[in-house]
Amino acid sequence: MGRLILEHTLQGHKGRIWGVAWHPKGNVFASCGEDKAIRIWSLTGNTWSTKTILSDGHKRTIREIRWSPCGQYLASASFDATTAIWSKSSGEFECNATLEGHENEVKSVSWSRSGGLLATCSRDKSVWIWEVAGDDEFECAAVLNPHTQDVKRVVWHPTKDILASASYDNTIKMFAEEPIDNDWDCTATLTSHTSTVWGIDFDADGERLVSCSDDTTIKIWRAYHPGNTAGVATPDQQTVWKCVCTVSGQHSRAIYDVSWCKLTGLIATACGDDGIRIFKESSDSKPDEPTFEQITAEEGAHDQDVNSVQWNPVVAGQLISCSDDGTIKIWKVTE
């Protein structure tokens, strides 16, 4: 069995902390929350400390933050219905663009693998795709409305310009750009959860997706492409996503976030029961019927709901979490 070892407990935000995001280099992270501020943290020696506080970009709670793949830009999604784009081009972080268009709270933001596209989603049930048109210029490329309820999360595929979204309507949607007319279309709807889908994340090569839900389960989905050896039908030559594994019984309340480590293959969950749990694929797992087992858990990882977990993209086994209790924690996971 593995271990979840607490390395650092950090404070600074006032109120609940909604999101944390590692910089691509893994030596810096950003956090955001109820206090309308973004904090940029870095490691000096063995001490994490706040280097910058960005407090003038939003008028309400900041729900999520994400670094661009190049690490030069930071996007923040807020309940004030805007998304802010920050950069450090002048030496200090500045808000260089504010993206407007959503009618209600923006819940999530995500950069594509190239950094050339940005996706946002909102309580207004829509998903927006933005093109980075140049220096600090963003153009709306698509407004997508296939969900029937609040959209909780958007995540780009790690190797292709494919977008996944998760919603209060219990579904996950996949989007891709049609090569002929350049229109963005919903290419797949993933149904199996029986309540809100809070979080989604791709594995390292993007052939599988993990989702977590209010129904207290996590599910593993696999992509079946046209001509697949499993014999799964692919109507209209479109990739089909099938639920190949459901992990249940470990969580007692809603699972708010899930992160699939691109370095180790481990899956971490953030739960409303204050716990963090780590799952590993079994050694005898089959591609079309994989099995995942819980290798370690910290039942009282935080004093209140755990809102976000994210694996460090560079340091294998390092995990960050944040909570309604106003703390950020950095963990070391051993197998």
From Swiss-Prot:
Pfam families, sorted: WD40
Name of the featured protein: Probable cytosolic iron-sulfur protein assembly protein Ciao1
Organism of origin: Drosophila melanogaster (Fruit fly)
GO BP annotations, alphabetical order: iron-sulfur cluster assembly; protein maturation
SMART domains linked: WD40
PROSITE patterns the UniProt entry points to: WD_REPEATS_1 (PS00678), WD_REPEATS_2 (PS50082), WD_REPEATS_REGION (PS50294)
InterPro entries given in the database record: CIAO1/Cia1, G-protein_beta_WD-40_rep, WD40/YVTN_repeat-like_dom_sf, WD40_repeat_CS, WD40_repeat_dom_sf, WD40_rpt
Recorded GO CC terms: cytosolic [4Fe-4S] assembly targeting complex; metallochaperone complex
UniProt keywords, alphabetically: Repeat, Ubl conjugation, WD repeat
Record PTM text: Conjugated to URM1, a ubiquitin-like protein.
Residue spans of the WD repeats: 12-51, 57-96, 101-140, 146-185, 192-231, 250-289, 301-335
Keyword flag Nucleus: no
Function (record text): Essential component of the cytosolic iron-sulfur (Fe/S) protein assembly machinery. Required for the maturation of extramitochondrial Fe/S proteins.
Protein family membership: Belongs to the WD repeat CIA1 family.
Domain of life of the source: Eukaryota
Keyword Ubl conjugation: yes
